[in-house]
From Swiss-Prot:
Keywords: Nucleus, Transcription, Transcription regulation. This is PIH1 domain-containing protein 1. One of its GO terms (cellular component) is nucleus. InterPro entries: PIH1/Kintoun_subfamily, PIH1_N, PIH1D1/2/3_CS-like. Its main location: nucleus. It comes from Xenopus laevis. It comes from the Eukaryota. GO terms for biological process: box C/D snoRNP assembly; rRNA processing. It is found in: Nucleus. Belongs to the PIH1 family. Involved in the assembly of C/D box small nucleolar ribonucleoprotein (snoRNP) particles. Recruits the SWI/SNF complex to the core promoter of rRNA genes and enhances pre-rRNA transcription. Mediates interaction of TELO2 with the R2TP complex which is necessary for the stability of MTOR and SMG1. Positively regulates the assembly and activity of the mTORC1 complex.
Amino acid sequence: MESDKSLLSAELNSEFEQALYEQMLLKAKQEMQNRLPNTPESKQIRPQPGFCIKTQTSEKAKIFINICKTNDIPAPPDLSEAELVNILESDDPSGYRVPMSIGEPHVEVDNSGNGCTVYDIVINSTFFDKMKSNELFREFFITVAMEGLENKYEMELSRDWRMLKNRKFMGSISDQNIRTKSKPIIQELDTSSSQTLQSKPLISEIQSSPKVPEYTIAAEPSEGHPSFLVAEISLPNVTSVRSLVLDLGEDRIVLWGRPDLYHLDIFLPYNIVQEESGAQFNRDTKVLTITMPVQTI
């Protein structure tokens, strides 16, 4: 396949090009950070109690999960039951995400006087009300919440759970720190050098039969533990940044180009600092460049 010279390559052919490439990356990163508003990256919230479920780990350890609510966390898209079923039956049901904050484990005492481990999970208040009154959404959310706990704390939870009656929470509910969403994640560039900042959508909608775009990922420096990663994604059919939905995980890039254009879901070789990452879409080259600082060892 003939390479596209508009894309930066991780393999440069000369020391001069290598030095020029590094200067461009560092300059772009510095400019993006200078344009970001100087606002707090996180804030402390006091969640409200909702309900509590009881389950256990694969080692039979008793686990309680407090499902809490707050207006400080955004709600997922408001779907009907039929729309949720269609998403769950699709090839990639992960496109529908529920924003949530998963707290640290804390030890409490149950009604029998025995010690137990409790986790607090906080979601949007409006979605909580819908989920609590709708069995399908409740089953879906609890499954997603358990998967979140399993991934974060590397454990296996039984799906045989029950909701506690007449008890909204186990133990005490602590304040949680949540990241604010004030930073723009995608910046649009054109020949006039004017840039339109777009907020990062938290959730993307499922599209049918999207195309996987061509991309490259470069590490800087190229040897040893890198300081940051740069991903370049070729999107020739995208005309505006408004059609892009970008979601950066700790070690993952998920990108949607709407309507029904592109879908990219890849894992990164290193964990990144999500809140310090940024992206630029160049309307001339149709290339989305994502600069991602790498977590230190």
